[in-house]
C-alpha cells in the first residue's frame, strides 16, 4: 500500500492495516469508523457511502469514507454477508486522557463464519464456521456456531464427503490446512464459501482443551483445536460459551446427501431457494428462534433409534391430546427470547442491559411452562418438567439490578436500580441536588435580571452556560457574567457559581456513570458463571418448542402417529399425502394414495403421463419417512414403516455444483451412489433414469439399473419411467410390481386422476401433455403423425439393424391434399370441448372458422 500521509495517525493506520491486508479496516476516529485508501473506494461503492478525501491540499489526497459508530453493525453485516472480512480497530484509551497519539488496536476480526449479528429473518438460521484438517486417514471436520457455542466434529473419508457436509451445513467459511485442487477451489467458489488459513495462538487457552476434551479421534481433535484457535485469534477475547464438541458419525442418522435434501426440498424450495414451499416451512410453527434452529437440525438428521423416536412421539401425543396444556405452553414460549444467543452475547461481553432483561423475562416464563406440564396427569410431560431448572436466582438477580427500561448504551448511565449500591445512590443525590440548584439558579437569574426567557443549558464543549437572546443582551449583568459563545440569535455566558456547581455535578455524573458500568459488568460476570446451566435450559426449551409445534401441526393438518417395524422391511401407508403439496392446494382437493410394499415387494415401477403425479408420489413417500423418523406425525390415515438408514434420489435435472458435471453425468453419478451404497434398509427414488441420452441407451441403462436394484441391493425403491418397455420386467423380477398413475381421455382432452393404480399404464399421453402446455397445433399435428408412423413401423427389433427409423417421410400419396392452414382449422375443430360452450359461443366459433377458411383461399 502506498503511504501517502505520514502523520502519526495515518502511520498508525498503515501499521495496523499491514497486519490485516485481506480485511476492510474500520478505524475508529471519534464518533466514526473511517475507511481509507482502497478500503474506502471499494467500501463506498458497496455500502453506498460518500467518498471524500483526507489531505485535500496535497498532491495525493487519501480516499476516505466513514460510518457513525452507533450504526457500524449494519455496515459490517453488509460486507460480511457478501463474503468479506472486517477488522474493527478501536480506540483503546480515552482520547481526553491520552498523551500523544491515542492507542488503537483490533478488538475483533469479523468474518463470514464468525458473524453474530443476524437480521430478524435469520434468527432461525445457524451460522457455522467449519474447520477441516487433511490427514493420511481422511479428513477431520469440526464446526461451531459462535453465536450459540454449539460445536460438533466428525471424521470423513474424502473431500467429496467434506464438500457434501459443507453444503449441508450451509457453512459460510472454512478454515482449511491442506492443499486445494483447482476442482476443490472451483467448488468452494461456486458454493460461496470463504476459505481461511489456520492460525496459531500464543500461550495456553483453556477453551481449546475444554472444547476438545471428549474427543478420541486424532483428526477430529486437530480440526477442533484448529477451529477454536481461529475463533480466539479473530475474536480476541475469552469464549467461555463454546461447548464441548460432540463427535458424530454420519451413520448415526438417516443419511441424505445435500443433493437429496435439495431434491426433496427439506429446508428450501428448489425453485426459489426460499423457505416457503419446503418441509421446514410446513413444519415450522415454533415459537422461539432456538426452536426453529433445532427443528431444522432434526429435519436434516432424522433418527435411527426407535427408542429415541418413540420418546419424541410420546411427548407429541401427550401435547396433542391436551389442548389446554399445549396452549398454555405456547403462550408462555412466546415470552421466551433466544436463550442460546443471549447466553453467547453474555459470554462474548457484547450483551447490553436490554438484552439482559430479555434473559430475565425469558427465565420468568419458565415457571409458567413447568406449572402447565406438572398440572397434567401425563407422566411424559411431568417427567420432562422435572428435569428443568428454571434458574430463578439468575432471574431475580437481573430484575433486582437493572431498571425496567434501560438505555441501549451501557456506558452512559441509567442502567442500575436505586438501592443496588449505596455509593451510586450518593452520587445520584449529588447529581439531583446539583440539578435542583441549576433550576433554582435559572429562576433566580430571571428574577434579578428581568430576562424572562433566560435559560441554563449544557453541551459537551462548554459545559453549563446561561443563554440570553440578542434582544435582552442589554440586561446582562456584565460584572457577574462572562461571555463564552456567540450564536446567531443569542449569547452564552458563565458565572463563577455556575462553574463551581458544574464541577460538582459533572464529577458526580462521571463517577455515577462509571460506577453503573462497573456494576453492570459485575452482573454480567455473575451471570456468566451460569452459562452451562443456561445452555442446558435453552436446549430443553427448544426441544419442548419443537415437540409442541409437532402437536400443533399434526392437529391442524390431520396427521397420524406412525408405527415402526424393525424385524422386516415393510411399508404400509394408507391414504398418504404429500405434506407440502396438499397445503398449497384447495382444501379437500388433494388425492391421497397408498404405499404398500410387503417383504416380497422391493420395487415399484411407476408409469403414467408426465405431470400426472409420479414425482409427487415418490417425494411423498420420502417425506413421510423423514417426518416419521424425526418424531413428527405424518400425513396419512395410517402408516407402518421400517427405519430407513439412507435415502437416495435421482429427481430433477440439474448440473452438479461439486464437480461441474453435465446433467446426464450427474444422473449416472447419483444412480451409482445408490447402487454402491444403498442397503436393504434404504429408500431409493429414481425418476426418469436414462432420459439424458439416446432412447435405446437410456432404456438399456434404466433396465439394467432396475435389475441391479432388484438382484443385488434389495432396497425399497420407487422407479418412475417413461420407458413402457420396462414394464415387462415384472415377468422376470419377482420382487418388482408395476403401478401407474391413472389418467383418462374425455372428448379428446386428457384428465389426470392422480390416483395410483396397479399394473402398467396403457399409454403415455405425451402429446396430450404437450397440448396442455400450449404447444402450437402444427407441432402437435406433426407429433401425432410421427407417433402413428412409429406405432405402425414397430420397435427397432422388427427392422434390419442398418435401417434407420424414418420419422420424416412424407404423408402417403393417397392422403387428400390439405394445406397447413386448413389443418390448423381442422385441429381447432377436433380439439374444441363443446360441453362447456353455449349455443351462441358455438355459432361464433363456426363463423370464425368459416372466415379463416375464406381468408386462406
From Swiss-Prot:
Its name, as the record gives it, is DNA mismatch repair protein MutS
GO BP annotations, alphabetical order: mismatch repair
- Keyword Zinc in annotation: no
Which PANTHER family does this entry report, sorted A to Z?
Answer: DNA MISMATCH REPAIR PROTEIN MSH1, MITOCHONDRIAL (PTHR11361:SF34), DNA MISMATCH REPAIR PROTEIN MUTS FAMILY MEMBER (PTHR11361)
Q: Does the keyword Nucleotide-binding apply?
A: yes
GO CC, sorted alphabetically, is: cytosol
**What species is given as this protein's source?**
Lactobacillus johnsonii (strain CNCM I-12250 / La1 / NCC 533)
Q: Which UniProt keywords apply?
A: ATP-binding, DNA damage, DNA repair, DNA-binding, Nucleotide-binding
